[in-house]
């Protein structure tokens, strides 16, 4: 989150320090969780039963579970440090080096602790907004956000993990060309969401598009996320309709906040600002 230091020196040092803090926290949590599971009055009785064979083998219930470290705002870090986004050659190289550095450090953590670690594109629905607010207060004149620069941004937020901004392009193939290599660097969960204004009615079109993506790209997970609305009187409505087209009553508009479908009105202010920026890929999808 630094806006001052070159990547090759203090930025990497600061990143390593934050990762070490995360490791220490995760190791403490793992020990506490193990104690709570192993106690005579276990707080996790069903999990204790389910993991009983792991306990017999390793003398630990949670030995096969991963400690996860993620990141947010890679695109904005590149803007702050280099003056370019990660859609550029220079910015993309920065993102790749950052992820490689984190992967290598996680391998060292595994060797040091004997526990599994992975690098994940964590959902971070709240963190992308909360940390942006902190940086807005700390660096009001120069902090880059996914939706603008500095104190003028009403509800700042950061992009998730190493994603491009949701309004970067309306061409899903351009998006995949720029993101494919980054997506494969995660050792935990990661996903690209293709936001659609409404559902795709032709299953054959969707089938063809999925086949094209799987045959030409390496990214591990992707979703097609249409928006829809729910009216208390008329039920499911295709697309984004704040008011029911049939009766005029207010509806609940649903979309994927990051990992789950939730009413947009229940999202935090940062995520609502992101929703308003989202490009839809309906045209690209339908022309397959």
State the predicted function of each range.
Residues 15-72, 76-287:
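Acidic, glycine-enriched catalytic cores built around paired aspartates
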